[in-house]
């Protein structure tokens, strides 16, 4: 019975070594798992970017809204019958209207 027990202990030791330190062991599993998680995060970011670019391409090829928006913002164009209002903030009134805080030196 002693030889069988010794053989089983050696086999158990070898299996534990292979599991923890050997090729494709726990260490490699954790590393690959982390690599996969990082790649999935990267893929989801790239997919969101691709979806956004795809929607913009669809809008530019078929829709007039994007063309109209760029014409308004970049070129300052307006439609016939529209009135354009530009609001300009008066910096001198903005500075004087703020309440001044007293300097308390003690």
UniProtKB/Swiss-Prot annotation:
Among its keywords, does the record have Membrane? yes
* Compartments reported by the entry: Cell inner membrane
Q: Which InterPro entries match?
A: Cell_div_FtsB (IPR023081), FtsL/DivIC (IPR007060)
Its keywords, alphabetically, are: Cell cycle, Cell division, Cell inner membrane, Cell membrane, Coiled coil, Membrane, Transmembrane, Transmembrane helix
Q: Does the keyword Glycoprotein apply?
A: no
Domain of life from the UniProt record: Bacteria
Q: How does it sit in the membrane?
A: Single-pass type II membrane protein
The record's Gene Ontology cellular component field reads: cell division site; cell septum; plasma membrane
Question: Which residues are exposed on the Cytoplasmic face of the membrane?
Answer: 1-3
Residue numbers on the Periplasmic membrane side: 22-106
The residue stretches assigned to a coiled coil in this entry are 29-70
Q: Which residues cross the membrane?
A: 4-21
Its biological purpose: Essential cell division protein. May link together the upstream cell division proteins, which are predominantly cytoplasmic, with the downstream cell division proteins, which are predominantly periplasmic.
- The family this protein is said to belong to: Belongs to the FtsB family.
- What is annotated about its quaternary structure and interactions? Part of a complex composed of FtsB, FtsL and FtsQ.
According to UniProt, the name of this protein is Cell division protein FtsB
Q: What is the scientific name of the source organism?
A: Photorhabdus laumondii subsp. laumondii (strain DSM 15139 / CIP 105565 / TT01) (Photorhabdus luminescens subsp. laumondii)
């Amino acid at each position: 019975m002693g030889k069988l027990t010794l053989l089983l202990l050696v086999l158990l030791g070898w299996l534990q070594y292979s599991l923890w330190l050997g090729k494709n062991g726990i260490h490699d599993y954790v590393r690959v798992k982390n690599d996969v998680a990082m790649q999935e995060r990267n893929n989801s970011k790239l997919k969101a970017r691709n979806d956004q670019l795809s929607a913009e391409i669809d809008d530019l090829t078929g829709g007039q809204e994007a063309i109209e928006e760029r014409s308004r913002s970049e070129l300052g164009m307006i439609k016939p019958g529209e009135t354009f209002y530009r609001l300009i903030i008066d910096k001198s009134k903005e500075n004087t209207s703020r309440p001044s805080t007293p300097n308390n030196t003690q």
